Amino acid sequence: MLFPELSLCGYPPEDLLLRLTVINRGPDPSELTVLPTIWFRNTWSWGLDVRRPRMRQGESGPGVSAVEFDHEYYGRRRFLCEGAPDVLFTENETNTRRLYGDSDGAPYVKDGINDYVVHGDKSAINPDRIGSKAAAHYVFSTQPEQPVTIRLR
């Protein structure tokens, strides 16, 4: 079960705090995987806007992972993840290989994070740690009814 809580810091108004609490509701100890994900809406593939914003691994501090990005409209931003999780990067692109058998499809596609986490496909995420979609990869070993909290900014 997931309980999200969003708080506004005040200034600047775009500075958001997010607290996610996940609880193992099963009767047995369990491993929980949580993937807080950020992405840019794909407007470049459809000719609406050819500019493609980029995210990249940012400078991380003790106990924190960072994603940095520049956007023409939103400016320079950072996504901070408490606990220093690995951050997985891919593109917010449709997997045309899987859907249509297109051999020229993008190498890193929107379902790449799923393929990495669920199927262990290391080639599904960008090793250069850049893309238009990123997810913080948290894995917790929990006891029954044990809550785990993640804080993001």
Language-model features: where?
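Coil-to-beta-strand transition motifs
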Residues: M1, Y11-L17, P27-E31, Q146-P147
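Extended, loop-rich substrate-binding clefts of extracytoplasmic carbohydrate-active enzymes
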Residues: M1-E14, V109-A136
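Hydrophobic residues positioned within well-ordered beta-strands of beta-sheet architectures
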Residues: L2-P4, L18, L32-P36, A136-Y138, ...
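Polysaccharide-binding surfaces and accessory modules of carbohydrate-active proteins
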Residues: L17, V22-K110
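Conserved phosphate-binding loops in nucleotide/dinucleotide-binding enzymes
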Residues: R25-G26, H137, S141-T142
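Short Pro-Gly-centered flexible turn/kink motifs
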Residues: F140-R153
